[in-house]
A protein has these predicted regions:
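Conserved PLP-enzyme active-site core in the AAT-like
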Residues: 2-293, 298-316, 324-331, 335
């Protein structure tokens, strides 16, 4: 089966499963799982932060970060297309009583600085207190421009705001930009990094930041139900991914470029964008449902919409991309 719906569909490789099976474990709620401790320390060092905290999901990692930065009735500034705002169930508002202030994203995924500045509320009892600016990198596959990140985080600091990065795919950004992940993490007070996407682990995200922030997030993790017992089995997969699956993300980026080039040869398809491991393309609306069914019959899973996203990952080869392109061509040729 060729699955282009997301990079969340990656499956553990036999060597990763072996690492999980051999993991030394303890009880992480008691803080004595050695493999979890090693993962947290390793990622903190790699990102240049003081401490890390292992979570079962990126949604929970992001939420704990927002709740560590903001109190009830506070506000965070975020892009309208950001995962923390649009795709995490409204958790900041529902569970954290944190008001989002969504702003329109620019085409490159950034939030214009003048809009951020204008959205910061004055100190007045009528307003929620603006406490945080949250960015995402990559966002829609796009790597945020380094100068923009520097300017946005500087603006936040000057206005007394904290900064959080949803870095679910920050290793994709690092590979694409040629910058170490520590350089991408450095401007932010906290960063959430996911291991169950392109890095290929089955479960897990790590939040990194200052020791004081992680101590607060640790309590919120418990409140949110994220405390796990013998979690070293999962942490071992993440450690394996750090050692073996980072540099190979370049292969996913190359396969995405290959996929985009193939779609561009099909008259009925309009490629909108290509960035890291994601391709966005438009298909005639009337063909989306039948094309998705056609592809599934041929062992290819997609989510066909008028504006469709295709995501490459470690379980998709260059030959698989060729099979996908041939199948799409075959569909339109039969019409």
């Amino acid at each position: 089966m060729i699955d282009l719906r997301s990079d969340t569909v990656t499956r553990p490789t036999p060597p990763m499963l072996a690492a999980m099976s051999a993991a030394e474990v303890g009880d992480d709620v008691w803080g004595d799982d050695p493999t979890v401790l090693r993962l947290q320390a390793t990622l903190a060092e790699r990102t240049g932060k003081e401490a890390g905290l292992f979570f079962p999901s990126g949604t929970q990692s992001n939420l704990a970060a927002l709740m560590a930065h903001c109190a009830r009735g506070d506000e965070y500034i975020v892009g309208q297309l950001a995962h923390t705002y649009k795709y995490e169930g409204g958790g900041a508002a529902v569970l954290g009583s944190i008001q989002p202030q969504p702003l329109e994203n620019a085409a490159d995924g950034s939030i214009p600085l003048d809009k951020i500045a204008a959205a910061i509320k004055p100190i007045d009892d009528h307003f929620a207190r603006t406490r945080l600016v949250a960015l995402e990198n990559t966002i829609g596959g796009k790597v945020l421009p380094a100068q923009y990140v520097a300017d946005a985080t500087q603006l936040a600091r000057e206005r007394g705001l904290a900064t959080h990065l949803d870095g679910a795919r920050v290793f994709n950004a690092a590979v694409a930009s040629g910058k170490p992940v520590a350089a991408l993490a450095e401007p932010f007070d906290s960063v959430s990094i996911c291991f169950s996407k392109g890095l290929g682990a089955p479960v897990g995200s790590v939040l990194v930041g200052s020791r004081a922030l992680i101590d607060v997030a640790h309590r919120w993790r418990k409140v949110l139900g994220g405390g796990m017992r013998q979690a070293g089995v999962l942490a071992a997969a993440c450690l394996y991914a750090l050692d073996h699956n980072v540099e190979r993300l370049a292969d996913d980026h190359a396969n995405a470029a290959h996929l985009a080039a193939g779609l561009e040869t099909i008259e009925q398809v309009k490629v909108q964008s290509l960035a890291t491991n994601m391709v966005f393309a438009q298909f005639p609306q009337q063909h989306c449902a039948p094309l998705e069914a056609w592809l599934k019959e041929r062992g290819i899973l997609t989510q066909m919409l008028y504006a469709s996203r295709f995501v490459t990952h470690m379980d998709v080869s260059s030959d698989d991309i060729d099979s996908f392109i041939d199948a799409v061509k075959g569909y339109f040729a039969a019409r």
